[in-house]
Amino acid sequence: MIERGTLTFRDAGPDDAEWIAGLLSDEGYPAGATDIRRRLERYVERECPVRVAEAGGERVGFVACQVIPRFEHNDQVVRVMALVVDPGVRGRGVGGALMAEAEKIADGIDAAFLEVTAGHHRPGARRLFEAAGYDASLTTYLRKRR
């Protein structure tokens, strides 16, 4: 277990692009460093945080959040769009710490709620989110592929 107090968090930057691309590619979401740099720029422009977790100066995971203003209410929602932990440290508390970081982001903007999308093909991720109190029985939107 990596102690939560030993993890530090910082905003992702262009120097993280190749590392993030590698993690995403390993998870079945192929991306190059150039793609990730563009995505990071887009997230910064929209004030959507991407945070990197480090332990002992080494990057161990990241979480990318979208801040979404709701039209039907005068508030915002935070959605976790991506959360990936380095395979070498999985099962040691990093994912939970990254979710806690996402919750701090949501608290910081007084978000109405925090939501996360977790595919059925990622049972470990679903268990992480459910253990953190997320309700897996909700279906909040429908999707049509374009």
Stretch-by-stretch model annotation:
Residues V85, G91-K104, R127, A131:
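Conserved acetyl-CoA-binding loop-helix of GNAT-fold acetyltransferases
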Residues G5-L7, D11-E18, G22-D75, M81, ...:
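Acetyl-CoA-dependent GNAT
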Residues M99, A106-A118:
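Conserved GNAT acetyl-CoA-binding A-motif
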Residues G96, H120-L138, R143-K144:
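Conserved active-site alpha-helix within GNAT-family acetyltransferase domains
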Residues I68, M81, D86, R90, ...:
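Residue-level recognition of the GNAT/N-acetyltransferase active site
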